[in-house]
From Swiss-Prot:
Pfam family, one: LpxC
Binding-site residues for Zn(2+), renumbered to this chain: H78, H237, D241
Protein name as annotated: UDP-3-O-acyl-N-acetylglucosamine deacetylase
Family from the record: Belongs to the LpxC family.
Catalytic activity field: a UDP-3-O-[(3R)-3-hydroxyacyl]-N-acetyl-alpha-D-glucosamine + H2O = a UDP-3-O-[(3R)-3-hydroxyacyl]-alpha-D-glucosamine + acetate
EC numbers on record: 3.5.1.108
Single annotated GO MF: UDP-3-O-acyl-N-acetylglucosamine deacetylase activity
Source organism of the structure: Acinetobacter baumannii (strain SDF)
Described purpose of this protein according to its UniProt entry: Catalyzes the hydrolysis of UDP-3-O-myristoyl-N-acetylglucosamine to form UDP-3-O-myristoylglucosamine and acetate, the committed step in lipid A biosynthesis.
Length: 300
């Protein structure tokens, strides 16, 4: 049987908040069977839990925020993608502020931290959401589409008319697994345009942004001295974001995802469209690991 997963032990770390510029503590804590992924604001008294649920998402300034009442946890997509890549079903993510630390702008540091905690199987079947028919979300010329597929394939295309974005590196496809995500996607960093930075900081946003946690793009190209980690790092990061956004459906998805200029808001609308009609999907489990179409790292 393919079983649910959590961590073996607590892992603690800290980093800088992208928008606040302040130090943020983050703790990963094992959670119970069917507990799901839960973000906990430990800077509040009493602490407030917010489940990682697509219906609680609000987009703000190019990131995904979980919101309940007037309480939020922002910039969750990178850590969610790391959690998804390791097949973790149940986890409490404690943060000491209203946002997850940005780390280096990729999912790599979060995968490293989670692996330090060790993976532990739980005595319950892992649930998957299998898409049964095409579902789409459209905004202007932007598209996000699910279609039936035996696995989880992500196809993404961006469209930037800019010297830093070579046309031949604006599309990418991956067949999702722990291995492909870790080696081909997880290290791809978020990116932003230098011309926007002054405006954001003047509005008390992106106060923690730097070339240590993002790819900076000016009018002519990439500002970072080390350049890009991959020739197509920009579109790989959009795939990274999509993996995190789509895991907010509550379970790993079995489908093909096609994104064209899609972002957090459109990814979330796609999930809401899936949920709006129960005939769009079914919950499945696998009695034999050989039948599971998504390969995860082994639990040792």
């Amino acid at each position: 049987m393919v079983k649910q997963r959590t961590l073996n032990r607590v892992v603690k770390a800290s980093g800088i908040g992208l928008h606040s510029g302040q130090k943020v503590m983050i703790n990963f804590i094992p959670h119970t069977v069917d507990g799901g992924i839960v973000f906990r604001r430990i800077d509040l008294d009493p602490p407030v839990d917010i489940p990682a649920n697509a219906l609680l998402i609000q987009e703000a300034f190019m990131c995904s925020n979980l919101v309940t009442g007037d309480i939020k946890v922002g910039t969750i997509e990178h850590v969610m993608s790391a959690i998804a890549s390791l097949g973790i079903d149940n986890l409490i993510v404690e943060v000491s502020a209203s946002e997850v630390p940005i780390m280096d702008g990729s999912a790599g540091p979060f995968i490293y931290l989670l692996m330090q905690g060790g993976l532990r199987e739980q005595d319950a079947p892992k649930k998957f959401i299998k898409i049964l028919k095409p579902v789409e979300a459209l905004i202007d010329d932007k598209k996000a589409i699910f279609s039936p597929h035996n696995g989880f394939q992500l196809n993404f295309t961006i469209d930037f008319d800019h010297p830093a974005f070579a046309k031949e590196y604006q599309s990418a496809t991956i067949d999702f697994s722990t291995e492909t995500f870790v080696y081909e996607v997880s290290e791809a960093r978020t990116f932003g345009f230098m011309k926007d930075l002054d405006y954001l900081k003047a509005n008390n946003l992106a106060l923690g942004a730097s070339l240590d946690n993002a790819i900076g793009v000016d009018d002519t190209g990439v500002v970072n001295e080390e350049g890009l980690r991959f020739a197509d790092e920009f579109v790989r990061h959009k795939i990274l974001d999509a993996v995190g956004d789509l895991y907010l459906l509550g379970h790993q998805i079995i489908a093909k995802f096609d994104g064209y200029k899609s972002g957090h808001a459109l990814n979330n609308q796609l999930l809401r469209n899936v949920q709006s009609d129960p005939s769009n999907y079914e919950i499945v489990t696998f009695d034999d690991e050989k039948d599971c179409p998504i390969p995860y790292v082994s639990v040792t």
